[in-house]
Amino acid sequence: MFKREEIIEMANKDFEKAWIETKGLIKSKRVNESYPRIKPIFGKTHPVNDTIENLRQAYLRMGFEEYINPVIVDERDIYKQFGPEAMAVLDRCFYLAGLPRPDVGLSDEKISQIEKLGINVSCHKESLQKILHGYKKGTLDGDDLVLEISKALEISSEMGLKILEEVFPEFKDLIAVSSKLTLRSHMTSGWFITLSELNGKKPLPFKLFSIDRCFRREQKEDKSHLMTYHSASCVIAGKDVDINDGKAVAEGLLSQFGFTNFKFIPDEKKSKYYTPETQTEVYAYHPKLKEWLEVATFGVYSPVALSKYGIDVPVMNLGLGVERLSMISGNFEDVREMVYPQFYEQSLSDRAISSMVKFDKVPVLDEIYDLTKELIDLCVKNKDITSPCNLKLEKTFIFGKTKKNVKIIVFEKEENKKLLGPSILNEIYVYDGNIIGIPETFEGVKEEFKEFLEKGKVEGVTTGIRYIDALCFKITSKVEEAFVSNTSEFKLKVPIVRSLSDINLKIEEIALKQIMSKNKVIDVRGPVFLNVEVKIE
């Protein structure tokens, strides 16, 4: 925390001096917590839910009212809607099944089995019989059965479960029995039920829409078909409704998603719940994709099907698959990968990978950490001096109760060389999924590598880490280790860099896996010719 009164007093005496000197009060983050190793984290919506919301707003702008249709549909409704075609349609429906409730009695044999477990049944026989009878009649839910048995016999729930497993094996042998109820395979089956209830209650004409999940028993799922999908469906009911309303709604709805020209082509399927010659496929042109796409189907419900539901006015229905529209909008090729990305390979961006390249060793003590910057500045300033040569950086620290004098010597003994090698200022970039070391200038770089490195520098993402930065942190970290181990001197020599570890860098496992799986590279090779001797007294 700032000492505010002292700062104000200093500023009153000499504002310029106070302004400069208080700079040191703003501490910089440590290297592994600084940008770009920290990055903003954003929430992410699902493309299907985005499309659903966009469709909702599009329908509402067109004056439609939102409804939720029944999801569970009796097979009788399918027969009413499809007539003779129903049997073929039901083949694609999922039927709901449930486990029967066995008639479990409390015979002398079962009482004996319970008592063999060390439980006295005689006092609780009537309560136990009542629970078993209640389960059979459906007044007791299955997930409460173990709890109620345990209460009745005044035992733990663990023992109650043991009784259910060992004394009443009938429960383990149950086989699900199908009902006559189906999961909605298309929104139309729900619309007929809704329209039947609204007939005579809601003034005509009315416009309704519903966006919800449907279930279809496909033979197999592939890149364009799932067993569960979302339908964005609407109906218009009124005395003057006909096929032209479908065309107008299709244009009004789809134009809000970037489609322009429209073609209306008679559908060859001819579903029996539509009036003959009204079932129509909608093809729309998308300027960005530059192609015609089938995006919706509409038709006017058959008077035969409507009459069976007590509806005596024409009804136009239009429907489209939400996932289909999402794939078009997001340029996805496989509906499975779009809907369930968690089951497919995830790709990290160059920016994400750049945040995962970190320093391996960094000093813990602030005083030694701060020494690193001095060492970096000294090396960069003198990197090109002619050898034989050496640089010295000397500093005194208090470690515990002991005074430590540290002398860092960077040297090159060989004649007519430079203090440090040509790659010492190379910077780590991430480009097209690769991690590469890019030189400060491209002078002397082979032509076969030059174009790639130039593109990497312009289009890639920098980590902000130079070889000299990471190596200097390695040196000061070893100084700190020497303090702890009471070592008086050590040497460090890094002639040629071949890997990230050579320059005191590491990469998170998730990024490394992607680089390897996608046949990308980590190429940080380069001569640095760093020679260091450290003496501690």
From Swiss-Prot:
This is O-phosphoserine--tRNA(Cys) ligase. Pfam families: SepRS_C, tRNA-synt_2d. Substrate binds at H186, M187, T188, S231, A232, S233, Y273, Y274, N317. NCBIfam families: sepS (TIGR00470). One of its GO terms (biological process) is tRNA aminoacylation. GO terms for molecular function: ATP binding; phosphoserine-tRNA(Cys) ligase activity; tRNA binding. It catalyses: tRNA(Cys) + O-phospho-L-serine + ATP = O-phospho-L-seryl-tRNA(Cys) + AMP + diphosphate. Keywords: Aminoacyl-tRNA synthetase, ATP-binding, Ligase, Nucleotide-binding, Protein biosynthesis. Homotetramer. Interacts with SepCysS. It is an enzyme of class 6 (ligase). Disulfide bonds: none annotated. Belongs to the class-II aminoacyl-tRNA synthetase family. O-phosphoseryl-tRNA(Cys) synthetase subfamily. The keyword Transferase does not apply. Transmembrane segments: none annotated. The keyword Chloroplast does not apply. InterPro entries: aa-tRNA-synth_II, aa-tRNA-synth_II/BPL/LPL, O-Pseryl-tRNA(Cys)_ligase, Phenylalanyl-tRNA_Synthase, SepRS_C. Its EC number is 6.1.1.27. Catalyzes the attachment of O-phosphoserine (Sep) to tRNA(Cys).
